[in-house]
């Protein structure tokens, strides 16, 4: 079976798979770089990427920022400049700094959940980075798109929809989300 490439703005993943961001040492440069090298979208998790840094206990935030930047650059290198994203939870205390770190270190996209990323368009403004919220309902994306359109005159580049079996697309979920996806696409094209 031939799959169509995934296009997000000017980014193209030959294989339409976005690897999920799994925290604390799972989704780092090795996994994300390998996925992107094979043609998918590799995703690094911003949840404690610096846990192996020698000063992690004393300087947690600095260790995490340093490690995240290094993991992004390393994943880009492993993947031969494939599509690399970062999953940043809205609930993280230093959310804005994580977004800035992604932009400064060459991540291609940010995927953000664990809350509604209401400030994300403002934080990425002026950069080339693509962004997406993680939502579980049409209502959530309608609220975000309405807010973003009013405040920033924009909406996200794509949307990640997570159902009760997050990260897994089953036939039953495809039916349920088909209408939702269509409505999201219509909204995106009208902005």
Protein language model features and the residues they cover:
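Active-site entrance/lid segments in N-terminal catalytic domains of soluble metabolic enzymes
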Residues: 1-191
């Amino acid at each position: 079976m031939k799959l169509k490439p995934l296009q997000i703005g000017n980014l193209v993943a030959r294989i339409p798979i976005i690897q999920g961001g799994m925290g604390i040492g799972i989704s780092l440069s090795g996994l994300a770089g390998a996925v992107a090298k094979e043609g998918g979208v590799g995703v690094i998790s911003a949840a404690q990427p610096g846990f192996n840094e020698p000063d992690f206990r004393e300087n947690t935030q600095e260790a995490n920022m340093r490690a995240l930047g290094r993991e992004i650059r390393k994943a880009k290198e492993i993947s031969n400049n494939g599509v690399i994203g970062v999953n940043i939870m809205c609930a993280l205390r230093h959310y804005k700094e994580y977004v800035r770190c992604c932009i400064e270190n060459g991540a291609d996209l940010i995927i953000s959940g664990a809350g509604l990323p209401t400030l994300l368009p403002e934080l990425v403004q002026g950069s080339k980075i693509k962004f997406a919220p993680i939502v579980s309902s049409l209502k959530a994306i309608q609220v975000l798109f309405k807010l973003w359109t009013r405040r920033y005159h924009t909406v996200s580049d794509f949307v990640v929809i997570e159902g009760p079996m997050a990260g897994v697309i089953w036939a039953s979920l495809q039916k349920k989300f088909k209408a939702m996806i269509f409505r999201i696409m219509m909204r995106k094209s009208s902005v």
